[in-house]
């Protein structure tokens, strides 16, 4: 085994089952590409991304860990968000939430 290697059995392995999801339309109003990582608190992303930020509180992108979504200038796309697990207390990022529900 190689350090960090994962040995996964055959078959499908669904991720994030049973967790609440939400779909939002997002548009990059800026003049530069914006990339958002898998676990970034979506409500606190770059202000050039135009979407319903209140609806995104306590949520992250529903994509595989370690991956990201890139928004090109002027691009509009639909994303699926997923509730954070556990106590759902969010700290850091841009400091807008700091644990508030």
Swiss-Prot record:
| Pathway annotation from the record | Nitrogen metabolism; urea degradation; CO(2) and NH(3) from urea (urease route): step 1/1
Major subcellular location class: cytoplasm
Its catalytic activity?
A: urea + 2 H2O + H(+) = hydrogencarbonate + 2 NH4(+)
Taking the record's annotation, the residue ranges forming a coiled coil are none
- What GO MF terms are annotated? urease activity
The UniProt record lists the keyword Cytoplasm: yes
Q: Does the keyword Cytoplasm apply?
A: yes
One GO BP on record is: urea catabolic process
EC assignment: the record states 3.5.1.5
Q: What EC class is this?
A: hydrolase
Task: Kindly give the InterPro entries that the UniProt entry links to this protein.
Answer: Urease_beta-like, Urease_betasu_sf, Urease_subunit
Signal peptide stretch: none
Q: Which PANTHER family match?
A: UREASE (PTHR33569:SF1)
Q: Which HAMAP family does the record associate with it?
A: Urease_beta (MF_01954)
> What protein family does this chain belong to?
Belongs to the urease beta subunit family.
How is this protein named in the record?
Urease subunit beta
Per the UniProt record, the source organism is: Verminephrobacter eiseniae (strain EF01-2)
């Amino acid at each position: 085994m190689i350090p960090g290697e994962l040995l996964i059995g055959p078959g499908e392995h669904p991720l994030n089952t049973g967790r609440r999801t939400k779909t939002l339309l997002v548009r990059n109003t800026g003049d530069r590409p914006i990339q958002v990582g898998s676990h970034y608190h979506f409500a606190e992303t770059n202000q050039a991304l135009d979407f319903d930020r209140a609806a995104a509180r306590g949520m992250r992108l529903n994509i595989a860990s370690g991956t990201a979504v890139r928004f090109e200038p002027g691009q509009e796309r639909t994303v699926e968000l997923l509730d954070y697990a556990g106590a759902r207390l969010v700290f850091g990022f841009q400091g807008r939430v700091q644990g508030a529900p």
